[in-house]
Amino acid sequence: MSDPRLQRKFLRAPLKSTALYVDGEHVFKARTLNLSEGGLLLSELPHIPEINSLPIAINLIQYPRFQGMALDDVKQLSTDDFARTIIKTKVRMVRSFENQSNVDKVFINFIGCEFYNPDPEFKLAVFSYVENFAKNTVYLLSLFESLGNRTEQLELLRSVAHLLGYDRRMKVPLLRAKVLHDYQSLGSL
């Protein structure tokens, strides 16, 4: 059995979106890579905050459940059609940047942040997002398993994958590997 200290406390899901954070009197924009009830992973930060705790607003996409949707309905969808919610809380950077020069900070690509005292509404929004993404990922994996030689099934698979943020042009084995990796990352290290 694996060491419980190495297990994640929360499920996490990819979130390719944006976040705004405040440092002093300035607002900065960053990319979000993944999200869990415990925190999120940011990239493309134009500025490493001077303080450890900062207010943040996250653009959270509201995916529908794709299972049971007809191919024509899925093909009509675009991520622009999905509702979005702006959720706000405070985060603490998990990694310390003390004793690093400003030049060293320029080369930092990712920053993990944990949520600091999120309110129940925020927690519910994150939980719902992660749970729904997980269900859609399981559905997408089931499409791989039942693929066979049916053209409609491949179209449905590629359409759902695209809506979840994957490149629909990838070769099927590579696409499956990426989806499987994200599925495995949902709950374990």
Specify the residue positions occupied by each region the protein language model found:
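Structured alpha-helical
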Residues: 1-189
